[in-house]
Structures are given as C-alpha cells and as structure tokens.
C-alpha cells in the first residue's frame, strides 16, 4: 500500500509539473500556407534556412488544391481563404518569435508564433486567429493551459458570431471559384487590355517566373516576367529539375524575388502569351521588379519578350547597362565594347540626296560632303533564296542571277520599301545618330549604322511597322545594335500581327517591269505614240548618267527607259573604269553638269513630254520638268552647263532656251567663261519697234475674267472665267491629297523661286504658291492661282506633289493701261479703294493693250453690261492721272484718256481740287 501510495504521489507530482521547455527562435515570415501553417526563414543568409511551423491545438479550413499537384482538384473548405488571408496580411515579411516541438510520431513541427522579438509582449498569432473565428480549436484529452486559453477564446468567438461562427454568413459564399486553367490564354490578355490588375504572387519558380492569382476572379496563372530572364534550375533528360546542378545566381535571384513579391499584393500587366504561359510586367510598391533584378545583375534583358512590353523598355535597358558598368553578379566578367567614334561621325544632320535599296541613304552635310548612312538593326526585303546571318548579311549566296537582274524590281517589296523612303526622305532634313560600326567582311565594306529621324520619327521603325523591313536578330550579349532596338522589335510584332508587307499571307509577287533600256524594239511601236499624245507623263528619275542623259521609270506603263533631254547639247562627264573598260575623261564642265542634274532630279518625281527617239531607237528624247516646275533643259542652259542645240529651233521652248543662253553668255558662266560677244554690225530693232511698224491699229479681243487681287502699284491679278471649273477641280484634288497625306512639319526647306504648297492662314487649306522671299523661319509666298501674298512660317510650306505642278498659274498679273497713280499717299489710297470697289471679285472684260517683256502686260477693263472703261472712269473722276504713251496703235485711246483728265481738271475733281498738280513737276518746283 505504501508503495502504491508513493507511486500515485509521484505520478500526481509529474502531472502537476510544467511541460519541458521548448526552444524559442526568431525569424521572418516568408509564406503562409494556410490558416494554421506558416514558413519562417532565418534573418541571415541568402538564401537563408527555412522552417515550416503548424500552429499547435488548432485546425484551419483546407485550401483548394489544383489538379495535378499531387492529386485531384479539390475545392476550398468554407472560410479557408479568409483564414489564409488573415495571416498573410498580418505576417508576410514581419519579424516574429516562435516556439516549436516535433512529436515523435509526426513529420510536422508544431508551435506558437508571436509578432516581434519578445513573446512576452508580442501578439500571439494563434490566439488572434482563434479570436477572429477563422480556425477551430482541437478539444481532445486534458487541455493544457495554452489549449484552455484557446478554447475560451473560441467560445467567445462563437458567442460573438465571428468568422466561421457567423450565423448570417453563407458557407457557399466563402468558397472561391478558382480558374486553374485557360483554354484561350490570349483571350484573357485581351480582356484586361494591358491594364494593371491586382494580384497575389503564390509561388516563385525562379527569378523571372512566378505563379499568381488575379483578383477578384481568381485566375491562376503562370507568369513569365516581360523583358528579362533570370538564371533557373537545370532540367534533366526527363525535363524535371536537376537539383544536383547549381546554376550561378539562380538561388539568389529566386530569393530576391521571394523577399519582395511572394504572397505580396502586386499589380500585373498582362502583355502576351507564350505557349500556355502568360507574359507580363509585375509592379510592386518600389516599381517594376524586372528593373530591380536587372540593376542587381540578377537578370538579363531578353529581346523577344521586350517586344511585347507596352512601356518601360528603355528603363530596363538602362538598368542592365548600370549592372554591366558596375560588373554586378552575372556581369562580373563583362568587358564593354567601346568603339572609337569621331564626334562628327557620331551625330549629324543633313539633307537626303539618294536612297539605296531599302537599307541605306546618302546624306549631304552642310559643308557639301555626302555620307552614306545605313539604318541600324534592320534588313530590307531580300531574295528568299538567300540565307541571312545574325548580322543581316547574306552568308549563303543566292543562285546565279541573270545579266540584267534588277533587285529593286525583282525582289518582292523592295520597290515598295525604296518608294517609302524616297517619298518620305528625298530632299528632306534628317537627324542621324550613330549606333555602331559594322566591321568589314568578305565583299562587304565597313558600314556606319545610324538611327535616322525625321520630324522626331524613327525612319527604320516606320519601315518595320509597314512590313517593308525586318529586324536583325542578335546574340543576347551583342550590344552592337540600334539604340531603339526594342521599338523596332515591337513594330515588327505589330506588322506580323497585322499581316503587313513582307508578313502578308498572300504570295509576294515581284514588280513586273518592262526594261526598255535592254529591249529597245517595243519603244517606237508600243509606247512612243501614247507618250507623244500625252501633254505630260509622270516619271521617276532612277539614274543620271550625264547632265542630259537619264534613266526614268514610268509608273503608268511600268517601264524603264533611257531619256535624253531635248533642245540642248551637254558636255560629256567622266566615267570610271568598269568591267574591264578603262576610265574616260570628261569634257570641261561635264562633271558639273552631271552634279547639277543629279541634285535636282535624281529619285525625284518629275513630269516629261516625249517628242521622239534617237536614231537607234534605243532612247527617247523629250522635255523634263522638275518637281518645282522648272524645265531642266532651260535650267542647264541658264547655268552655262549646256548650249542650245539647233534641233530646238522648231520647239515651243526655243525662245526660253535662247534667253537663258544669252544670260549665261552675259554672265560668262561655266562653258561661256571665255566667251566674247560679237559686235553687231547693224542696229538691233526692238520687238516694240517691229510691232509699231507692222501694226498701226489697236487689237480688241475682250476676255471674261474675275479680278482676284489688286496691288498697291495698281497692278491686278485676274482669272479666266472659262478656266473656273478646271481650277475648282484642281483645288479639290490638291486639298484631298494633303488631307490623306499630310506633310511632316518642318521637313521641307523652301528656297526663293520654289513652287510649293502653302497652308493659307484663313482656312488652313493648301494652295499652290511661289516662294518670293525667305527670312529666317518665315517665307513670303505668292498664291499663283489667286494673286494674293502672305508671309508664313516655313513649317506651313511643303513640297508640291508633281501631279499639281504641271498646270500653269490660273491667275495672271496685269497693269492697268494708260493710267498712273498720284504721288500723294492719301490720293493713292482713294484711287485704289475706288478701283477695288469697281472690279475686285467682279466679273469684268479684259483686253490686253500692250505686251511688255519682263513686266505685267498692260490691259484695260470694262463693265460687261455698260461697257464702261474702268480706267477711263478713274481718270474722269479725278482719281488717277492719264499716262502719256507713244505707241501709234494706242493714240486714239490715249487721246480719250487725256480728254477725260482735262475735264476732271477743269471741274477741280479729287486730285485736281487745288489746281493743276502736274505743275509741281515743273523745273521751278524741283
């Protein structure tokens, strides 16, 4: 008995003794697995050790399990998500103190967690979640003191109806409807439309791949972070992670992301899809996680996924550049490629003078030097038979091509690419910024590659966006690329998506061109008759062989033909050695003539009139007008770079040519440098003297006109009434053309004498105009179809399309015949006011009384109904003076004007009210 009593006493003492002390540790909560389980990591180490703690004495509702994750799909138990979220929001990233114990028959470690470093003062997390009614307390056996406290807290939660004990909450409402998979991932990307969506990161596979829930619809996605790639786990032959192989910085990158994103509230911007994975940007409180990884050297930029990013690619590149310069982590062995750039080569601006086949241009600098500029990181359309290397060069030659192979026309889309550049750039100012120098290789010289901009737009990007060029693909560590490479890739993706140009599904047919420079037989029979009938034919100058010999492309007939300028004889230019033919020296000023013609017409839109062919029938001969409306034959003659050929005598342009030649001779220009004018043996009779001898009678041929403008010198502009419908048609087409193809502001540099399009201030419509003066950023223009003048900023001027330059001006300037304005300013203003009231914007009848060389023709105006002569009426009202003229044919009209003036003087009208104003011109008043 005593022994039994002693034994009982000992047993009772053992039960009353406190439990064995458990070890207390501190750490940071990394992850919340459920309402009763957390993962805590140590505060030191990268990555640090971790411990999973399950709360003692409580049981949380089980979260849903995705299919394939170790079993079949299961649903949330009611309140499971709320329980998990309570802990997540309270604990993630928070330093805690915890105790744990591992029962002998369990693989789990159970314990308690307190917020902070001191469990005596810190919040007991297990008690807090019980108090909220989000877990159940285990009630088996004799409860310990801690367990009894939890039971009491649970009873209080039940009584208060908190959490899962709420009598009003529906259990079904506390179960998530999770979308574990997506049949059409791209559709989900389209739904969110690139807008940030709230999300929670649930798992970090590696530094650049995570799994997340998109809220509030609980789409479960695997997300590859846009624009970057972090080191990841190596896979074995079965495609499973091979943990035996350690990839440098893989664990560090994953840890970096876990500490900032795992189970944090973030925003995700979905941008694309790759297989079943989504591609997007993760935004957290400190910005874009991709940018942070790059700055730490834990990630590298990836071109293909940067292309899908909406914004921020420049920041990613800058972050990677920072890590490279600091040689951080992955870049610890990085060696920068620093090619030496001359400052003049690096950045410059100039005018484009020639476009090559889709990938290069010639730019003339302010000092006259011409530089060949290649576009960075793009390649033009190419022969599909060729194999292209990573740097854009053909590394496997295409099969041999024919003797007359012309890649511009025979390679699909090459002509479209060239035309895009030609229309956009020729004779326009561009900015060139050097990106890299491509080293020389077999058959390819060194290339200077630039980003070329016009009006702030990247030309290469515009080409790629239209499907007229493709991007060069580089090795990931190759920095020799365009400074706007990411924009180029993005533009290419859009072109592919839109099936534009090279990316269209239909077969890329070549441009069918009839090359009449090779096959001459069809010129006379098939083409010449229609060209001769046409007043003007639109063409493109493809090549200039000499000052007067060109090769033109006629789009209407899709043919190439050699074109010789009519009416002139031009010195022969020099020729380099080519294909075994020795070099040939040119005639004096032959090269200057070649340069003159190249600068004005090479790759420009021109209009031509073809008269005939040469003797061999291999070339056509005709007249060519530049895009500014100048006759090129006349321009060459006037510059002293050609002389008039005898064949021009029967041409309608002979007089213009002779006048131009006389001017060149007088100025001793170029070929006329040593010209000595012959002394005339007989007196030269002027045109007016000839006319006086032959014509003694005044010719009357009234034309119906509308006066559109009156100048302060009493000249006026008039339009023929018969041409009104043609003018309206021309203006409608011009306005429509500029509306559909608006010019780039500032891309055109006007020069005095240019025929341009000007945007009129009052209605902002475009009209034909001639530049009369350029001062700084302003230009004074004459609207040639109306006669009014205006001073405009040069950015309101644009090159006039060739289709609108061939028609003559619809407004003609005349001087009011036989009258002169008074010298007094007030009298002058009164005369102009009266004349304007009589004729401005009115339909009147006009008769040319005298043709004057170099000045407006003299004309009289009369009322079509009353037949009143407006000039004589102004004289009769004493507003203007009658002019004394000596032409015999005008004698009768001059006498009538004098009689009207005498009557006004006697009546003391207007300017005569104080007497005879002509007496002021007497010698005693001078």
From Swiss-Prot:
GO BP term, example: mRNA catabolic process
GO molecular function terms noted in the UniProt entry: endonuclease activity, active with either ribo- or deoxyribonucleic acids and producing 3'-phosphomonoesters; nuclease activity; RNA binding
Catalytic activity entry: Endonucleolytic cleavage to nucleoside 3'-phosphates and 3'-phosphooligonucleotide end-products
Outcome following mutation: residue 320 to K: Defective spermatogenesis
Chief location: cytoplasm
Organ and tissue specificity: Expressed in adult ovaries and testis (at protein level).
PROSITE patterns named in the record: TNASE_3, TUDOR
Compartment(s) where it occurs, according to its Swiss-Prot or TrEMBL record: Cytoplasm; Nucleus
UniProt keyword annotations, A-Z: Cytoplasm, Endonuclease, Hydrolase, Nuclease, Nucleus, Repeat, RNA-binding, RNA-mediated gene silencing
Start and end residues of each Tudor domain: 749-807
Disruption of the gene: reported phenotype: RNAi-mediated knockdown results in defective spermatogenesis.
Residue ranges annotated for the TNase-like domain, each copy included: 23-167, 195-333, 346-505, 535-674
Region (Involved in dimethylarginine binding): 760-788
Quaternary structure note: Associates with the RNA-induced silencing complex (RISC). Interacts with the RISC components AGO2, Fmr1 and vig. Interacts with piwi.
Identification of the protein by name: Staphylococcal nuclease domain-containing protein 1
Gene name, Swiss-Prot/TrEMBL: Tudor-SN
């Amino acid at each position: 008995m005593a022994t039994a009593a002693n034994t009982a006493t000992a047993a009772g003492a053992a039960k009353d003794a406190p439990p064995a002390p458990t070890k207390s540790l501190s750490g940071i909560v990394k992850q919340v697995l459920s309402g009763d389980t957390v993962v805590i990591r140590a505060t030191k180490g990268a990555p640090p050790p971790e411990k999973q703690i399950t709360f003692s004495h409580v049981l949380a509702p089980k979260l849903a399990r995705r299919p394939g994750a170790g079993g079949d799909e299961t649903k949330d138990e009611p309140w499971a998500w709320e329980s998990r979220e309570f802990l997540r929001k309270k604990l993630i990233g928070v330093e805690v103190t915890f105790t744990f114990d591992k029962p002998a028959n369990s693989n789990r470690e159970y314990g308690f967690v307190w917020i902070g470093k001191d469990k005596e003062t810190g919040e007991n997390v297990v008690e807090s979640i019980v108090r909220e009614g989000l877990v159940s307390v285990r009630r088996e056996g004799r409860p310990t003191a801690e367990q009894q406290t939890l039971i009491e807290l649970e009873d209080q939660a039940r009584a208060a109806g908190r959490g899962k004990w709420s009598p009003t909450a529906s259990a079904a409402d506390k179960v998530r409807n999770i979308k574990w998979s997506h049949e059409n991932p791209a559709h989900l990307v389209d739904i969110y439309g690139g807008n940030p969506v709230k999300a929670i990161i649930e798992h970090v596979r590696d530094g650049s791949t995570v799994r997340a829930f998109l809220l509030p619809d609980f789409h479960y996605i695997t997300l590859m972070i846009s624009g970057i790639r972090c080191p990841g786990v190596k896979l074995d032959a079965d495609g499973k992670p091979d943990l035996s192989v350690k990839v440098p910085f893989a664990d560090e990158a994953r840890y970096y992301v876990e500490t900032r994103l795992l189970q944090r509230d973030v925003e995700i911007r979905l941008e694309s899809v790759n297989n079943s994975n989504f591609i997007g940007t993760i935004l957290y409180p400190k910005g874009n996680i991709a940018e942070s990884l790059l700055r730490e050297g834990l990630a590298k930029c990836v071109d293909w996924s940067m292309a899908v990013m909406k914004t921020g690619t420049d920041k990613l590149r800058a972050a990677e550049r920072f890590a490279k310069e600091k040689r951080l982590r992955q870049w610890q062995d990085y060696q920068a490629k620093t090619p030496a750039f001359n400052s003049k080569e690096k950045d410059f601006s100039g005018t484009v003078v020639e476009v090559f086949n889709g990938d290069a241009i010639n730019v003339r600098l302010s000092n006259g030097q011409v530089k060949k500029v290649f576009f960075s990181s793009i390649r033009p359309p190419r022969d599909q038979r060729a194999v292209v290397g990573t740097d854009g060069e053909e590394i496997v030659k295409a099969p041999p091509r024919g003797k007359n192979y012309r890649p511009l026309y025979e390679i699909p889309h090459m002509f479209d690419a060239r035309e895009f550049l030609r229309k956009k750039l020729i004779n326009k100012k561009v900015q060139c910024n050097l990106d890299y120098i491509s080293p020389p290789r077999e058959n390819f010289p060194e290339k200077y590659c630039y980003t070329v901009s016009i009006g702030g737009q990247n030309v290469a990007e515009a080409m790629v966006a239209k499907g007229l060029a493709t991007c060069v693909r580089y090795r990931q560590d190759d920095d020799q690329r365009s400074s706007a490479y990411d924009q180029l890739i993005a533009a290419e993706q859009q072109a592919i998506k839109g099936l534009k140009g090279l990316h269209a599904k239909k077969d890329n047919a070549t441009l069918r061109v009839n090359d009449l420079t090779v096959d001459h037989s069809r010129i006379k029979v098939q083409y010449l008759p229609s060209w001769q009938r046409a007043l003007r034919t639109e063409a493109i100058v493809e090549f200039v062989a000499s000052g007067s010999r060109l090769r033109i492309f006629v789009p209407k007939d899709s043919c190439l033909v050699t074109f010789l300028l009519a009416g002139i004889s031009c010195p022969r230019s020099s020729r380099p050695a080519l294909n075994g033919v020795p070099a040939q020296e040119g005639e004096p000023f032959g090269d200057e003539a070649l340069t003159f013609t190249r600068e004005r017409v090479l790759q420009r839109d021109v209009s031509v009139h073809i008269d005939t062919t040469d003797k061999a029938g291999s070339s056509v001969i005709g007249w060519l007008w530049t895009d500014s409306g100048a006759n090129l034959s006349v321009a060459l003659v006037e510059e002293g770079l050609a002389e008039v050929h005898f064949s021009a005598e029967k041409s309608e342009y002979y007089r213009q040519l002779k006048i131009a030649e006389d001017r060149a001779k007088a100025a001793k220009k170029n070929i006329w440098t040593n010209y000595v004018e012959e002394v005339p043996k007989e007196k030269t009779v002027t045109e007016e003297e000839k006319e006086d001898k032959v014509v003694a009678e005044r010719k009357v041929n009234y034309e119906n006109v509308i006066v559109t403008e009156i100048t302060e010198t009493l000249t006026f502009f008039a339009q023929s009434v018969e041409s009104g419908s043609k003018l309206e048609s021309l203006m409608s087409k011009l306005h429509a053309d500029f509306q559909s193809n608006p010019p780039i502001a500032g891309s055109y540099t006007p020069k005095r004498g240019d025929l341009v399009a000007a945007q009129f201030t009052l209605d902002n419509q475009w009209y034909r105009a001639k530049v009369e003066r350029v001062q700084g950023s302003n230009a004074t223009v004459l609207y040639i179809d109306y006669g009014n003048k205006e001073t405009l900023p040069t950015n309101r001027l644009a090159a006039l399309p060739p289709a609108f330059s061939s028609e003559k001006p619809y407004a003609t300037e005349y001087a009011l015949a036989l009258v002169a304005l008074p010298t007094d300013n007030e009298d002058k203003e009164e005369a102009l006011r009266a004349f304007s009231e009589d004729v401005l914007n009115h339909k009147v009848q006009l008769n040319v009384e005298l043709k004057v060389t170099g000045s407006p023709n003299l004309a009289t105006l009369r009322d079509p109904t009353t037949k009143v002569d407006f000039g004589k009426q102004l004289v009769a009202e004493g507003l203007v003076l009658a002019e004394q003229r000596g032409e015999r044919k005008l004698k009768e009209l001059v006498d009538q004007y004098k009689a009207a003036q005498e009557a006004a003087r006697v009546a003391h009208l207007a300017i005569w009210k104080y007497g005879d104003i002509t007496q002021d011109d007497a010698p005693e008043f001078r």
